[in-house]
């Protein structure tokens, strides 16, 4: 869909661009403020995709992502990057719904 505002009388039509082969049942997704990284959340894990220079999203989503584990949560439902795109916030649908922060720079250092 277009990222710029459209006239309210205009019908926006979404088109499937590609299938993402790495997981099933996505529950949330967010893009970094610079538009170069995406995080996709499932009930069990998060997946971080980083675009290469001049790469489109369909091709970026075909590459193997970095897996992010959120062991303390059950049925993760919502995900968001922090303001600068250096951390990810995740919460679950179970009450009480804790908010977990993952520092992406630290997760890059883990084996």
Model features per residue range: what roles?
Residues 1-111:
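Sequence/structural signature of beta-propeller domains
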């Amino acid at each position: 869909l277009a990222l710029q505002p459209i006239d309210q009388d205009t019908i926006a039509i979404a088109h499937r661009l590609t299938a993402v082969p790495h997981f099933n049942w996505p529950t949330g997704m967010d893009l970094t403020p610079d538009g170069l990284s995406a995080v996709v959340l499932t009930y069990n894990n998060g997946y971080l995709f980083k675009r290469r220079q001049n790469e489109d999203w369909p091709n970026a989503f075909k590459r193997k992502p970095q897996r992010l584990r959120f062991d303390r949560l059950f049925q993760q439902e919502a995900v968001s990057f922090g303001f600068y795109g250096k951390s990810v916030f995740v919460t679950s649908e179970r009450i009480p719904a804790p908010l977990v922060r993952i520092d992406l720079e630290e997760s890059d250092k883990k084996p």
